[in-house]
């Protein structure tokens, strides 16, 4: 992310294609292999910015948090709703306005977190979790992160090797935390 950031529809689409759809399609492509393993793991990279508490719409929060009724189809409809709202200039009106900058990045991580929970429910024999590894020194953060890439890799690697049986969880580095 750069210091000056203006979201265009093309950039919004690109962000969602990379952060949400890319993760989703890769996971779905690998599921047959993961299911045939006795130790299948999926570790999705998220962000503290993707927590539900940043949504100012109680209805959207409730829908995204209702893991018993949220489906992949409903989640994809929510992603489409976000895109449509952006295109129509109606993010705030439709409850998608997120505080601060980088709204689509935040929304994409909210969608990643929801997908993680749905997939964990659908595939109980796999360990599917998401992690926010912390603010990292990358081009995306203009190298302002507080940790190196090597340091940030510790938490995803920990989850990839974890045998605890825990699934569908959100980790803040190495600690389980709430999706809020």
Task: Annotate each language-model stretch with its function.
Residues 125:
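Catalytic cores of secreted/periplasmic or lumenal enzymes
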Residues 27-28, 117:
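A short, exposed helix-loop element centered on a Lys and neighboring polar residues
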Residues 2-16, 35-121, 132, 143:
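Catalytic loop of short-chain dehydrogenase/reductase
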Residues 32, 47, 59-62, 129, ...:
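Flexible domain-boundary/linker segments
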Residues 25, 110, 130-138, 142-180:
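C-terminal helical subdomain
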